[in-house]
Amino acid sequence: MATAALFETSITSLPLLHRGKVRDIYAVDENHLLIIQTDRVSAFDVILPTPIPEKGKILTKISRFWFDKLAHIIPNHLTDITPESVVSSREQDQVSDRAFIVRKLKPLPVEAIVRGYISGSGWKDYQRSGTICGIALPAGLREADKIPDGAIFTPSTKAEAGSHDENISYSVCEQLLGVSLAAAVSRHSIALYTAAADYALTRSIIIADTKFEFGLDEANQLYLIDEALTPDSSRFWPAESYRPGKTPPSYDKQFIRDWLEQINWNKTPPAPPIPEEVLVQTIEKYQAACRVLTQ
């Protein structure tokens, strides 16, 4: 692939705070962070050795689109500060079109997953127990079926790179967050998902599920943080190929997950390198999702 990929940033003008699975985070000042979307890709909570060129820029564009579109539901951590203004001139190519300056908030210790359709780990849970994260669902549902009575909130723990997220029950979420905050996170998550899913359907995309993250400011005001409804955090299905009973081809990194399942990787580090043909098809899916949703 002709375009060079950014696997890891090397900003020296700011202190590095954290390298996540995909994002590198730097301190700007005591109230702001620089978050850079690299081209790293993770699957099954493991970072793969092969970056996907332009992926970080695509995720940044999609996140900004959703942060703006959904700001009437809940405030988010974005600021008007330009990333180029806080780094040196020689570092600007590392932040251009792939970074945000955000408010420094206290992240909540759960991932807020919303499922509108049964797929992925939710489908596996349902096959095993008839439930997803302790939520009982009617018998006889098929893979990729729309969940009766509307989307459900199914939180999980937040894993560091190399560890695995674990689905948790709502009662455990309440223990971690407190009753009122858990209720607010659940309510806002479902409202965000519903608004996004309704819009996406007008663009012939089904958002099967997604993951949100939230943070609190010093006044305990809740904010949407991290990323929003990207192909990394969501399952996007083309509506025209949707058929209940089988998960359709998607505009997201499920393509990489499927490839990893096919080669029988054991889902522990080190991950195998991604072949060129899988890379090309993955970036085409990300580009298509961005084009269809944001234009």
From Swiss-Prot:
Q: In which pathway does it act?
A: Purine metabolism; IMP biosynthesis via de novo pathway; 5-amino-1-(5-phospho-D-ribosyl)imidazole-4-carboxamide from 5-amino-1-(5-phospho-D-ribosyl)imidazole-4-carboxylate: step 1/2
Q: Which domain of life is it from?
A: Bacteria
What Gene3D superfamilies does the annotation carry?
Answer: ATP-grasp fold, B domain, Phosphorylase Kinase, domain 1
Reactions accelerated catalytically = 5-amino-1-(5-phospho-D-ribosyl)imidazole-4-carboxylate + L-aspartate + ATP = (2S)-2-[5-amino-1-(5-phospho-beta-D-ribosyl)imidazole-4-carboxamido]succinate + ADP + phosphate + 2 H(+)
Annotated GO CC locations: cytoplasm
GO BP terms, alphabetized: 'de novo' IMP biosynthetic process
Q: Which GO terms describe its molecular function?
A: ATP binding; phosphoribosylaminoimidazolesuccinocarboxamide synthase activity
- Tell me which Pfam families the record gives: SAICAR_synt (PF01259)
Q: Which family does it belong to?
A: Belongs to the SAICAR synthetase family.
Q: PANTHER family annotated for this entry? A: PHOSPHORIBOSYLAMINOIMIDAZOLE-SUCCINOCARBOXAMIDE SYNTHASE (PTHR43700:SF1)
The protein in question is named Phosphoribosylaminoimidazole-succinocarboxamide synthase
Please name the source species: Nitrosomonas europaea (strain ATCC 19718 / CIP 103999 / KCTC 2705 / NBRC 14298)
